[in-house]
């Protein structure tokens, strides 16, 4: 399980214990969730990084790529990893 899966598992343990108890194989669930999050972050960061301005220098490029990664990670963390305990629709979607 990667760090995204471990972070999600801890979040569910703290904020969604009843829902966590319904998962037959938490290890497999959070392993897959972590892998999905990592893939989604990479894809979103890559898409965001495509917006390259002309005459960009090395430092500007590094800042753009770092910002793209951070934005993608923030979005995915909110959607998949640190799901709002009050958002029953998102929780149901994650549980399948």
Predicted regions mapped to residue ranges:
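Extended, charged helical/alpha-beta scaffold domains that provide interaction surfaces
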Residues: 1-96
């Amino acid at each position: 399980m990667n760090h995204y899966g471990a972070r999600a598992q801890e979040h569910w343990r703290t904020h969604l214990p009843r829902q966590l108890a319904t998962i037959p194989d938490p290890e497999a669930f959070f392993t897959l969730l972590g892998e999905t999050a990592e893939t989604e972050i990479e894809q979103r960061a890559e898409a965001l990084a495509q917006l390259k301005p002309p005459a960009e220098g090395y430092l500007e490029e590094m800042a753009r790529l770092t910002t793209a990664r951070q934005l993608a990670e923030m979005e995915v963390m909110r959607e998949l990893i640190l799901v709002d305990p009050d958002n029953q629709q998102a929780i149901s979607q994650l549980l399948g």
